[in-house]
Amino acid sequence: MKPRLLTTVTTWLALVLPVVYLSRPCQALPTVNFTANYANSTSIASYNLEPEIPYEELEEPRVLPLKAVLPVEASTVDSSGVIDASKSEHHELPLADAAIQPHPDSNSVLKVILEQPESNDEPVTSTHGYPTFSADDNFVPSKPLNLSVLEVTSTTIKITWREPEKLNGAIHGYRVYYVHQNQTLLHLPILKAEAAVNSVYTYTLSNLKPYTDYKIIVAAFTKKFDGEPSEVSQRTDIAGPSAPKVVNLTCHSQDALFFGWRIPQTYYNTIDYYIISYRNVVYADFREIRITANASIVETSMIIPNLTTNSLYEVKVRAASTSVINPKQIILGSYSEPKKINVQLNCEKIPPPSQRQSYNDYNLAVMIGILICCFGLLFIVLTILLWKKCFHAAYYYLDDPPACGNSGGGNSAGIVDWEAPCEVAGEMRSSIPVCEFAKHVAALHVDGDIGFSKEYEAIQGEALNDEYPSEHSQHPDNKAKNRYLNVIAYDHSRVHLRQVPGQKKHLDYINANFIDGYQKPRAFIGTQGPLPCTFDCFWRMIWEQRVAIIVMITNLVERGRRKCDMYWPKDGTEMYGVIAVKLIREEVMATYTVRTFQIKHTKLKKKKASQTEKLVYQYHYTNWPDHGTPDHPLPVINFVKKSTAANPADAGPIVVHCSAGVGRTGTYIVIDAMLKQIEAKNQLNVFGFLRYIRAQRNYLVQTEEQYIFIHDALVEAIDSGETNIKMDAIGGVVNHIEFIDSQYKLITSYQPKEINLTSALKPVNAIKNRSSLVPLEGSRVHLTPKPGVEGSDYINATWLHGYRRLRDFIVTQHPLIDTFKDFWQMVWDHNAQTVVLLSSADNMSFLQFWPNESEPIESDYYRIRLVSETSENDYIVRNFVIQSIQDDYELSVRMFENPMWPDMAQPRSIFDFAVRVHERCAEYRNGPIVIVDRYGGFQACQFCCISSLAMQLEYDQTANVYTYAKLFHNKRPGIWSSYEDIRQIYRILSYMPKELGLLKCTELRTEFDEAAIMTATPDLSPLTRPAHIMSQHYNRFLKLLERWPVDQSKIGRDLGQYLRDQLKAVLGGTNIIAVKDERLVRQHQSLENIVNDVHLKAHPRSLNSTATGLSGEQCREVLSSEFLEYLNKEGGFEKLGLRGGRWMSTEAVRHVPVMAAEAIKFLKPQDSELFIDMTFGAGGHTKQILKAAPNAKIITLDRDPVAHELAQEMAKRYPGQIYPVLGRFSELPAKLKELNVNQRSIDGMIFDFGCSSMQFDEGERGFSISKNGPLDMRMDKDRCPDAPSAADVLARIDEMDLARILKVYGEEKFAKRIARAIVEARHSIKKIETTKELAELVQTCCASEFRLDKLQRPSHPATKTFQALRIFVNNELNEINYGMILAQHYLKIGGKMITITFHSLEDTIVKRHVMGNVANDMANKLPLKYCSHTICHDQTVMDAALKPNWHQMTKHVVVPSDAEVEENPRSRSAKLRAVVRVE
């Protein structure tokens, strides 16, 4: 709003002031000078009287009443003020009448008349003249009234308003402003205030942007001033989409065209329709087809039917969108370029015109080819001559630094100004000051992170539009070098390996790109996780590019999938091509591992021997989930800082890789660049930098979740600042109270929500808590639950990480009397052999929870016995043995009681105690350290902090108190009560001796398994535990399995009983020898988990629970090493009904017709009657009909060519009775016409829906889960080879549609999760092309490796996904719908129809037809764009056909008997309906 200005106008008035005194004659008054200031339109702010004679010469009283006159307005207004001129020369005079409004741009006269009070005479007025009075912008017009919008289009907005209520002068016109996106202020030329009806004005804003928000401002103005503004906001309407791009127009058949197009490049809001216009060029008019559209689908296609053969057709398409102003209005877009094509017979066999060349064109191409070959040969000869002249025959190259200009075809050395503001997707983007970044991120987080979604979509959109060449990645010689098909290396920025004499040109390829850092071109090399075939290329790149730091952000195997191969030696030295790599040292930390390699070039010549070897450091981050983000950004920030700081100034780029080299790799690079930009310029631009580096390698920062994590990490980095404190500076920090207090506030800023404390706040668990210090759900320690006992898995204990391991400590409260056994259960379950007690027993609230030497503690599974107790200088050491009651397994536990820690006599004793504890733990290295204080709070967490930070100080002479304190608080809020707690940690660390030895006694060595390497810091207990202990665990498992409760209500269906019987039969009395072969670890499913999951409903427990008293981890160790090894060797899996460690599928069973007896009972076939077996399959039902009526005639229909062949064979055995027909339900009318079968002539029809068992038996058909094969699922792929397979559907479908398919057709409760995983795998790994790939991917998305069917039998978790895809690919539900209609038309009155369904949707369609309650969309809720064809019916014909004429033969649906289900498991979900055709 334009501010009101104050302008002072001074008017000198020469006034003749007559003064009349009572009882005295009138005499002339002196002339007085007058000064007036206008404060607003209704008052005079001040005036100044300057009489020509002194005041004291005036006779008493000197009271001068005042009258103000405005002659221009032809009115005189008396003021209510009386002025005493003797008291002051400065007075304030309000004009009481607010109606007086002087015109500031007109001549006004102010006349002041002084008169004698109480005089009856007329005032004497003497005026020397009226001076000119002018005012300032105090007098501005008020707001225009009733500003509103009349009409809106995509580029115009018509507005209207009325003139202001207060004009305050002559209105010269109006100014109209409009604001676009709060950044671009545009104003229109001045509008002349022309006459308008009733003072109503209109104006049309033009040349606006479609679908854009505008704020419109209107203000009146006078000759000198702008008035107060009125505002209104309005969004313009959408404009029509741009022209779609036609990508396919082919002749589909003699009367149909196949037409495909791509979504328009530009559209607003959404695309609602496509309008396809086509015409025979003989005619002028176009015909139109309108179809609904989905803006998320990039390519759309359809078949245009009912065309004239041997005609030329012209086709074009345009998109249309619904108006956002008027939903009833459709905004049409531009037409695509018209395309023409001939429709003719057998056109599908004729190549398109683009492939047919004229004879002259062919000759020209041949001539050009010959010339190219000649030049090529000449070039090769010259190249060979030059090579022989300039190079030695031996293989070598010099160790020169890579040129910055062109050592690999990389991006330009110049720095692109990505920091400059730019407009993307209609919005301005620029660098954000550090002080405003937190507010900026908070704004992006609102409304479900909608701001992040928009920014990331803008980046993704640009990436899709940028088509950078990647020819080398697509070369046949190089495709095998790409881990993922769609993650390639752009040619312009890829890293070139130096040529080896004699090698092919394309052997210089590696899937790696140069990526710029902040103000440093080619600061990084982003690459994929090396494959075995690229190990040598990878190490050549390390050597040639002078790399000193490798950053690895992936584990070798994640979620059962190999993400990277181990490209370095496990021990010693290995050769990778010409590079020898030796592992020198390995330091394992909780979240990352640092490895030191010595690499040597074995073929290098012309260099000193000392320069043939280099040291390379690998920083391997091991706690970053695939496609996800870490739980907290602090460890990542520290990792980025340490790894980048380790790179020497004269070294080459830092090589960063994850699995694909795009998602986590890009996240790392962006965080580093932004940290450097903050340091250099105190600002940052995440959007601009990521947008810039995406032109150097595709898919950098692969998910929106990673993009959000970058912002959150940078907010944390800005808030916390530098948190690593050097050893010699720690003492100074102790006295820096403000610094510690600010850290404390940040450390304790996180406040958990109630959902994070679900278990701790349950009433059954609340009594187990001493205080408000309770564990969060994500970090609490779980106990082995007791069947049927709620809360039996809870204990007030929290996992905390240490310097070496993620689960190094368990912090817990002093046990209550009711939780003594829970405490020892925790020690037993998690194999914790070291306990630190920092509280003392007082025989009141804090009781002794350990046994005396004469009184052991017993539970249902174990006995705790005190072995010894000794006192040392500052603490007491107790040794316990926990003995299993079922077997002879023992667990030794040592307890250190030190209630005075850290208030000990000598500072050195604080650290000596920590060393002593960790030395004890190092003896076993197979479990956590349990730390106990009164409430599981400050004292226990202080011990964890001190011991972890002492190791850090030994390793790199820095301590990060802030990180440990904050992460501990986030896992157990409330442990720090004041900044003094943090200060005390700094104080203790300042006493730390330089040589402590704590780091050495906790040293870990990464153990890698040859088959499945899960993490760089695994639990090493299986490798250190004696073999006889493993056997004891196994024996315990067998014994306790026998005690598993048996469900007597379902004889023969109880899995527990089944397993027990089979175990006895298979194992007998065999003694199993412990096996140490690591290759078997975690390759097979735990039998224990199967038992638990099967009985989950009857005996509720968590999925991680066990029935044996063993922990889930111990069961996996036992079963994966000893038991499964034995079963593999002895064929035990087959004897157990298991295959390869997993449950056998029930698919592979002999073909038995389902409910054949019931079907024949209702069908009642008679000789000479005509039947149709609508789903012949293997002919089971047909055989039963012929058995009941030997002379009956049967038409056998099946879409499967294999089934059709079986029908033909049967027809040879029954000549004149079997009539095989190959086709779908929808094709039956034409087939029956060929057989001269008319409507109302069939005596009975039988439907057995679903997939036949022989289709499951053949893996190459693509239906089977247990047998690997191509993911096909087409029942009639030989007849319709162009129809999309299941693999085609998964390669093209979007996530939303896929989730809907799985949800509706498969009734899959994990539909969204599975759909997301399939789409992510398609983009980041490869397209899913085999049944095994799909089955394994679905399995990773489910909570268990099997599910229970309706008979409580284990089935594969991918069963429902396969079912949904099969139904969709084969358009089964639509076919069922057609089948029901055909039955109504072809059955005689009295004819019978038998339907057998296996899916709820199948039965629903049948039921609705039978009941006469058909919903037209029942079978077609999903888009049919992936189906092989679309069949359209006239609506009136459909309505007539769907009239019900059925009588049900049974009141309820018929289900199979228990005996049949046992004999034929496929029948378990079958439902039979029998109906009769009536009038």
Curated annotation (Swiss-Prot):
Signal peptide range: 1-28
Record-linked Pfam families: fn3, Methyltransf_5, UQCC2_CBP6, Y_phosphatase
Active site annotation, chain numbering: 658
Gene Ontology BP annotations: anatomical structure morphogenesis; neuron development
Enzyme kind, highest EC tier: hydrolase
GO CC aspect terms: plasma membrane
Localisation: Cell membrane
Segments passing through the bilayer: 366-386
KO phenotype (gene knockout): (Microbial infection) RNAi-mediated knockdown results in reduced West Nile virus infection levels.
E.C. designation(s): 3.1.3.48
Keywords: Cell membrane, Glycoprotein, Hydrolase, Membrane, Protein phosphatase, Signal, Transmembrane, Transmembrane helix
Cytoplasmic topology ranges: 387-1479
Glycosylation sites (chain numbering): 33, 40, 146, 182, 248, 294, 306
Main location: membrane
4Fe-4S as UniProt keyword: no
Membrane topology, from the record: Single-pass type I membrane protein
Function: Putative protein tyrosine-protein phosphatase.
HAMAP family assigned: 16SrRNA_methyltr_H
Protein name, UniProt field: Putative receptor-type tyrosine-protein phosphatase mosPTP-1
Annotated organism of origin: Culex quinquefasciatus
Taxonomic lineage of the native organism: Eukaryota, Metazoa, Ecdysozoa, Arthropoda, Hexapoda
